[in-house]
């Protein structure tokens, strides 16, 4: 190989390395724009159950909350409650939804709906509630409100969603309400089928609860949208990625530090984002809706649900 060719190859490699380093530094600097919300680091305070505590680091569970609010500072119920599980042993990424109407015990407030925990005491109480009622080991969270989610989706260029004919009228109806608040013009969804939805359309899709599947299908739609965002981010090129990161992160709140977010993101992509496994809890046949004092709650078989959730999240991993 001639010296000129060697120099040319070395120059190309040097440029690639430089771009990679600059991109990494840029992304890291933008991580500081995430709103850091400190929560307790004490396992006892977070109600980490002894049944889940010994699993070690084979599976990392992070709570994800989709918040129903219009102003950053106002108290909000968690319209979506999910657990993102990074399973290092089986090299899987799993996304679990917990029904928001689940009838659970919330510290200081007695038995009520799961999604009230965030409004009563923010992310820390919400994490405590999940851990204590489902015997889990969640120590951190990520949260985004629906307006932030809309911005994120628009930044990645929309997401591909399979829209059914019975969902169209609800998508357009939800968008009309959002448009009044945001003073925007809506772009109505016209036809069913797989299509690229913009931020407002995709968020409206995720909020539908009046089709035949009710709230059960709603949780599935929420997971579909979140998974579509993950897949879209993974496919971004090196020139697009910094732009997306700079726009995405200011919409996010988290207990994780910038270093931890980088580490978690790297782990998630390394484990594979193309086929995120999904599940919803409680499972069918182990729960029933019931009116208590005129309010709808979802009652569930606690022992069975805990066992099913652990089997799904931890699989064959045994406590240390």
PLM regions: where:
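C-terminal solvent-exposed extensions
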Residues: 44-52, 71, 102, 253-320
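N-terminal post-signal-peptidase region of extra-cytosolic proteins
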Residues: 46-51, 64-70, 77-82, 116-131, ...
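Entry/capping segment at the start of metal-dependent catalytic domains
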Residues: 6-90, 266
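Amphipathic, coiled-coil-like alpha-helical scaffolding segments used for oligomerization/assembly
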Residues: 120-183, 257
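Soluble non-cytosolic domains of exported or imported proteins
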Residues: 74-78, 108-109, 117-125, 143-147, ...
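Extracytoplasmic
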Residues: 57-60, 76-81, 90-98, 109, ...
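Second-shell loop/turn segments in exported
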Residues: 69-73, 112-120, 135-140, 192, ...
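Flexible, polar/acidic helix-loop-strand segments at domain edges
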Residues: 154-237, 319
């Amino acid at each position: 190989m001639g010296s000129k060719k060697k120099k040319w190859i070395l120059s190309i490699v040097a440029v690639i390395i430089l771009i990679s380093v600059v991109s990494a530094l840029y992304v890291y600097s933008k991580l500081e724009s995430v709103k850091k919300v400190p929560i307790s680091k004490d396992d006892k305070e977070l109600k980490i159950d002894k049944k889940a505590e010994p699993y070690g680091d084979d599976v990392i569970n992070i709570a994800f909350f989709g918040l129903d609010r219009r102003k950053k500072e106002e108290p909000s119920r968690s319209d979506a409650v999910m657990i993102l599980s990074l399973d290092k042993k089986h090299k899987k990424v799993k996304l679990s939804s917990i029904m928001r109407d689940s009838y659970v015990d919330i510290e200081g407030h007695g038995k009520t709906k799961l999604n009230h925990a965030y409004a009563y005491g923010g992310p820390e109480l919400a994490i405590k509630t999940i851990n204590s009622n489902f015997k889990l080991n969640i120590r951190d969270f990520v949260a985004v409100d629906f307006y932030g989610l809309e911005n994120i989706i628009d930044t990645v260029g929309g997401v591909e969603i399979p829209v059914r004919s019975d969902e169209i009228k609800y998508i357009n109806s939800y968008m009309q309400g959002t448009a009044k608040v945001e003073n925007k013009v809506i772009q109505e969804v016209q036809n069913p089928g797989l299509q690229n939805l913009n931020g407002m359309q995709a968020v409206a899709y995720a909020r539908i609860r009046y089709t035949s599947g009710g709230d059960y299908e709603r949780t599935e739609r929420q997971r579909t949208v979140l998974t579509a965002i993950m897949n879209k981010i993974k496919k971004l090129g090196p020139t697009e990625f910094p732009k997306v990161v700079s726009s995405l992160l200011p919409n996010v709140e988290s207990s994780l530090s910038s270093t931890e977010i980088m580490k978690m993101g790297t782990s998630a992509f390394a484990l594979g984002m193309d086929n995120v496994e999904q599940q919803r809890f409680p499972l069918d046949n182990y729960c029933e809706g019931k009116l208590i004092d005129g309010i709808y709650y979802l009652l569930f078989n606690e022992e069975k649900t805990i066992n099913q959730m652990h089997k799904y999240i931890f699989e064959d991993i045994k406590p240390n």
